Each structure stands twice: as structure tokens, then as C-alpha cells.
């Protein structure tokens, strides 16, 4: 791990913790059981799939916990008052980009085979989260 990647990881973690806090402060009054199950499943699926994607890597355990931060943010987004199909689903897609990135480090052996899919899911997820946040501000006025 280089100093640059460690600093990037800290910035990543801080930004997602901050976003998770914002979502947690804006929880929907009532969520259905299915929404709760979806929110609970995202962190579990993220960690398990990351662990599997990193097989053969020397940092499997530590790095498989990395998406737990973004997945926790996604779970709070799913449960929040922000539009579910923009912010919640967008955050879940964003988490998928983290898992795809880790797959490139692990089972894909830095092949870059899923590079475009990784970046596309990152951009689409981020855009959906941003659009959900923007529409929430418009709806609240």
C-alpha cells in the first residue's frame, strides 16, 4: 500500500461516512419489510462478493471489508427519505463498482477486463445518487 492509495482510502472512507450520516439523519418514517431486507442485504453481499473476488490476493480479508463502508452508506440511502430508485439504487450500483474494482485486484489479476463496466457502474451510481439528492431538495421546497 502506497501513501497515495492510503490517503485516497481515508478520503474515500470519510466521504462515505459523511454521506451515510446524511442519509441516516433523513430516514423515511416507514419502510416495508422488503426495503429493510434490501438494505440489510447490500452490506452482506458486498463483503461476501468482495471476499470471493479477492481470492488469491495477499490482502483478501482486509480489502474485502473495504466495501463495507460504501455498502453501509448504501443501506442508509435505501432507508432514507431520498428517492429510493435514484439514491438507494444508485448507491447500490456504486457499491457494485467497488466490488468490480476489487475483482480486478483479485481473481482477474489486474487484467482490466471489466474496467469499462467498473467505471460505468461508478459513474451511473454516482449520477443517480446526485440526481436523487438534487430532486430531494426540489421536492422539499
Q: Where is each model-derived feature located?
A:
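Polytopic alpha-helical membrane-helix bundles and their juxtamembrane interface segments
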Residues: 1-141
